[in-house]
Amino acid sequence: MTAPQEPVDSTPESGENAATPGLEDDLSAELAALRAELEAAQATVKAQQEQVLRAAAEAENVRRRAQEDVAKARKFGIESFAESLVPVKDSLEAALAQPDQAAQAWREGVEVTLKQLTAAFERNLLKEIAPAQGDKFDPHLHQAISSVPADQPANTVLQLLQKGYVIADRTLRPALVVVSAGQG
């Protein structure tokens, strides 16, 4: 902080202070201009702060809507799959409600039910993994239960023990297989 200055005597002693009223006018004009600049800068800062708050609120709204969309997709995805399975359950219940059916009638009913279930799987992107003998072992789709010496190259599927399933491109359950350990 600067030391207080002594008041300037406003009585003209000589010609030096004769320009003081013009200097005061210049300083007053400069002060007014600086005040106007300050007010403009403060208004700009306030506007930018409001913009930041609006942007933050918009980002929060986008995040919330995205969460709601994910929740709805999950809910309705499950709903679609459930709707596909209802006819399968209906067929099984109808088969059980029939008294004294012959073995052939039961077999035909089970085949129809299996077709309905397969169609439900296909509609919901659920696909079977059923590697054939001689296929190359894929650790992303298969799970080797055992490895046995064989005439096949190593890591070749020898036997399918249980089918696997993928849903959309994600393995739901790997196929259980026996693989070749190579020639032993």
UniProtKB/Swiss-Prot annotation:
Functional description taken from the UniProt entry: Participates actively in the response to hyperosmotic and heat shock by preventing the aggregation of stress-denatured proteins, in association with DnaK and GrpE. It is the nucleotide exchange factor for DnaK and may function as a thermosensor. Unfolded proteins bind initially to DnaJ; upon interaction with the DnaJ-bound protein, DnaK hydrolyzes its bound ATP, resulting in the formation of a stable complex. GrpE releases ADP from DnaK; ATP binding to DnaK triggers the release of the substrate protein, thus completing the reaction cycle.
Species in which this protein is naturally found: Bordetella pertussis (strain Tohama I / ATCC BAA-589 / NCTC 13251)
Keyword Chaperone: yes
The protein, known as: Protein GrpE
Primary location: cytoplasm
Gene Ontology terms describing biological process: protein folding
Assembly and interaction partners: Homodimer.
Gene3D superfamilies (UniProt xref): 3.90.20.20, Head domain of nucleotide exchange factor GrpE
Alphabetic keyword roster: Chaperone, Cytoplasm, Stress response
InterPro entries: GrpE, GrpE_coiled_coil, GrpE_head
Gene name as annotated: grpE
Keyword field contains Zinc: no
Region (Disordered): 1-26
Entry-linked Pfam families: GrpE
GO annotations of cellular component type: cytosol
Localization terms from the record: Cytoplasm
MF annotations from Gene Ontology: adenyl-nucleotide exchange factor activity; protein homodimerization activity; protein-folding chaperone binding; unfolded protein binding
Organism domain of life: Bacteria
Family: Belongs to the GrpE family.
